[in-house]
């Protein structure tokens, strides 16, 4: 009986593959938006429907793979690269599982997931802008700073999305301008949940699973000090950094990251330069304003490598960038508290006096703006999905037998991203 089941499994899978809708049969690819270590993100629209103008972002993940036959330089006798697929990345699994469950107006909406020819495609609603793009636009000398009403709306919406995540026992762990999308109607959408994780009942310590989280400029001080256990407060520190960047149009703590030794990946180096940038603005932390300071693994490194005692300088920094709103400064102080136990929570930040004073928070962050932000740069010199579709058709013609030669013939496709384009700042992790 078991033998018969095994024999009929192949034809069944083949029939299933023939009936499964492919990416290109459902969506028309307009071009690709960004590329990174995870794969690529494409702009697309539906085919053959009344809502053909509805736009989508298709995130195609690279498969975790490794090459074999190293004695032959990873190529077969015909010169084609030999690739063995080993599964789905942990970040892809996390993002798929979390996005399927989350439904909030300030979180990017997952529309569909398609598995096709060993590639995973996540279909999201499309957002025309992100905060990195908006900040970059306003950083041009001829353009005025971001209006206060726009900053207020953007930050409130970010906090609203973060509150929703935290209420559902999820922290994002990679909040930064490039991961904050904004729709054409001025609605914030927090994206890229690849590092997000549930924290109510973890099976192992958070540090064990991911030793390095949050992009360095937005990384909370407790993480820089090697915290093995941390709280959602790390997301609020990142929101504070984003608020400061919206006000000043440049990262407030722009340090240089010390890279992990490739020969000792278990050891994470102390990020001296990044911590230096923080103390220059916030002052040197002490046991008085951070009682648990000496409990962190990197406390000794902190004492030995950062010997200068800096006074608090955030108020002067705030004046230097031309800001004067006192409540906005108080909100910034609350988000950038050293002690995570004292730092503002997302729900408390939502009702901060800054958001209660005039001008009122607008649901549309672009309300009243007399400018239009440029649309995302779309790159059309890419045929990665097209190539994948051709492979899939070949796969089906052969009754499910994978044609390695056909697959490998597409490995030399030029998918380079113009990192120097002035209209769209490149990013490693973008929606």
Curated annotation (Swiss-Prot):
Sorted alphabetically, the Gene Ontology BP terms of this entry are: negative regulation of filamentous growth; negative regulation of transcription by RNA polymerase II; nuclear-transcribed mRNA catabolic process, non-stop decay; positive regulation of transcription by RNA polymerase II; protein destabilization
Q: Where is this region: Disordered?
A: 397-431
User: In terms of domain of life, where is this protein from?
Assistant: Eukaryota
Q: Please state the Enzyme Commission number of this protein.
A: 2.7.11.22, 2.7.11.23
An MF annotation (GO) of this entry: ATP binding
Which coarse location class applies to the principal site listed for this UniProt protein? nucleus
Protein kinase domain location is: 27-355
Its recorded reaction(s) are: L-seryl-[protein] + ATP = O-phospho-L-seryl-[protein] + ADP + H(+); L-threonyl-[protein] + ATP = O-phospho-L-threonyl-[protein] + ADP + H(+); [DNA-directed RNA polymerase] + ATP = phospho-[DNA-directed RNA polymerase] + ADP + H(+)
> Compositionally biased, Low complexity: which spans?
407-424
Q: Please name the Pfam families in this protein's record.
A: Pkinase
Q: Which sites bind ATP? A: 33-41, 59
CDD domains in UniProt: STKc_CDK8_like
- Which keywords belong to this entry? Activator, ATP-binding, Kinase, Magnesium, Metal-binding, Nucleotide-binding, Nucleus, Repressor, Serine/threonine-protein kinase, Transcription, Transcription regulation, Transferase
Q: Where in the cell is it found?
A: Nucleus
> Subunit arrangement?
Component of the srb8-11 complex, a regulatory module of the Mediator complex.
Query: What's the stated role of this polypeptide?
Result: Component of the srb8-11 complex. The srb8-11 complex is a regulatory module of the Mediator complex which is itself dependent transcription. The srb8-11 complex may be involved in the transcriptional repression of a subset of genes regulated by Mediator. It may inhibit the association of the Mediator complex with RNA polymerase II to form the holoenzyme complex. The srb8-11 complex phosphorylates the C-terminal domain (CTD) of the largest subunit of RNA polymerase II.
Q: Which family does it belong to?
A: Belongs to the protein kinase superfamily. CMGC Ser/Thr protein kinase family. CDC2/CDKX subfamily.
Q: Give the protein's recorded name.
A: Serine/threonine-protein kinase SSN3
Q: What organism does the UniProt record list as the source?
A: Scheffersomyces stipitis (strain ATCC 58785 / CBS 6054 / NBRC 10063 / NRRL Y-11545) (Yeast)
Q: Which gene encodes it?
A: SSN3
């Amino acid at each position: 009986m078991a033998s018969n089941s095994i024999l009929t499994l192949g034809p069944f899978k083949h029939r299933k593959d023939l009936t499964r809708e492919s990416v290109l049969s459902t969506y028309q690819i307009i071009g690709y938006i960004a590329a990174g270590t995870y794969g690529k993100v494409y702009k697309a629209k539906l085919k053959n429907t009344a809502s053909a103008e509805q736009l989508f972002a298709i995130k195609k993940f690279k498969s975790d793979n490794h090459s074999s036959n190293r004695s032959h330089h990873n190529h077969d006798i015909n010169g084609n690269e030999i690739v063995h697929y080993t599964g789905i990345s942990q970040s892809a699994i996390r993002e798929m599982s979390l996005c399927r469950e989350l439904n909030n107006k300030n979180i990017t909406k997952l529309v569909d997931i398609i598995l096709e020819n060993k590639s995973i495609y996540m279909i999201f609603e499309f957002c025309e802008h992100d905060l990195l793009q908006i900040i970059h636009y306003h950083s041009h000398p001829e353009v005025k700073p971001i209006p206060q009403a726009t900053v207020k709306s953007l930050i409130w919406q970010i906090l609203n999305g973060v509150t929703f995540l935290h209420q559902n026992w999820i922290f994002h762990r990679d909040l930064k301008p490039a991961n904050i999308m904004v729709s054409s109607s001025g609605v914030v959408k927090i994206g890229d949940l690849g590092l997000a994780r549930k924290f109510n009942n973890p099976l192992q310590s958070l540090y064990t699973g991911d030793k390095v989280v949050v992009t360095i400029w937005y990384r909370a001080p407790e993480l820089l000090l090697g915290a093995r256990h941390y709280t959602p407060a790390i997301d609020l520190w990142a929101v504070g950094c984003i608020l400061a960047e919206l006000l000043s149009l440049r990262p407030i703590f722009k340090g240089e990251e010390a890279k992990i030794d490739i020969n000792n990946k278990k050891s994470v180096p102390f990020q001296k330069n990044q911590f230096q940038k923080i103390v220059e603005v916030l002052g040197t932390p002490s046991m008085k304003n951070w009682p648990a300071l000496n409990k962190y693994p990197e406390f000794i490194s902190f004492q030995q490598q950062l010997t200068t005692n800096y006074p608090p300088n955030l108020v002067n920094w705030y004046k230097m960038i031309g800001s004067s709103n006192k409540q906005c400064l108080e909100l910034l102080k609350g988000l950038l508290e050293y002690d995570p136990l004292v730092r503002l929570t997302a729900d408390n930040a939502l009702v901060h006096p800054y958001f209660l004073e005039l001008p009122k928070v607008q649901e549309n962050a672009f309300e009243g703006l007399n400018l239009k932000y440029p649309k995302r740069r779309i790159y059309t010199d890419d045929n990665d999905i097209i190539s994948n579709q051709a492979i899939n058709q070949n796969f089906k013609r052969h009754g499910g037998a994978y044609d390695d030669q056909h697959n490998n013939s597409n490995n030399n496709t030029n998918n380079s991203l113009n990192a120097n384009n002035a209209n769209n700042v490149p990013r490693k992790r973008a929606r």
